[in-house]
Regions:
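Hydrophobic face of amphipathic alpha-helices that form TPR/SEL1-like repeat modules
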Residues: 23-32, 63-66
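Short helix-capping/linker turns of helical repeat alpha-solenoids
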Residues: 16-23, 32-34, 39, 47, ...
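Generic signature of intrinsically disordered, low-complexity segments enriched in small/polar residues
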Residues: 5, 27, 32-33, 47-50, ...
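Alpha-solenoid helical repeat scaffolds
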Residues: 41, 45-48, 63, 82
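Terminal, low-structured helical/coil segments at or just beyond the last alpha-helical repeat
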Residues: 2-9, 13-16, 20, 63-88
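Residue-level detector of alpha-helix boundaries and kinks
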Residues: 11-12, 28, 50, 62
Length: 88
């Protein structure tokens, strides 16, 4: 039985032409703590990317996550989303 940890960002790279559903699912993954850790910065980033790709319901979830974040954390998430867009 596997007893290690899987780095989700390395294990499931998302291509630039990925469907919005995949990006949305990544937001849900980090917002819900499915990995055992809630990461609001990552959740905001993926919801933001899903919204940019046309997933309308990602906007509401991004807003909900942002309400639990500091301005610094939101800026970090936005920076990470911009970086992802430029590298993919």
């Amino acid at each position: 039985m596997f007893q290690g940890q899987i780095d989700q960002d390395a294990a499931t790279p998302v291509e630039a032409n990925a469907i919005p559903d995949v990006l949305f699912e990544r937001g849900l993954y980090w917002a819900s703590g499915r990995s055992g850790v809630v990461n609001l910065v990552a959740a905001h980033k993926w919801f933001n990317l899903a919204a940019l790709k046309g997933r309308a319901d990602a906007i509401a979830l991004r807003r909900e996550v942002a309400e639990m974040m500091s301005e610094v954390e939101i800026a970090m998430a936005q920076r990470e989303a911009r970086t992802w867009l430029t590298t993919h």
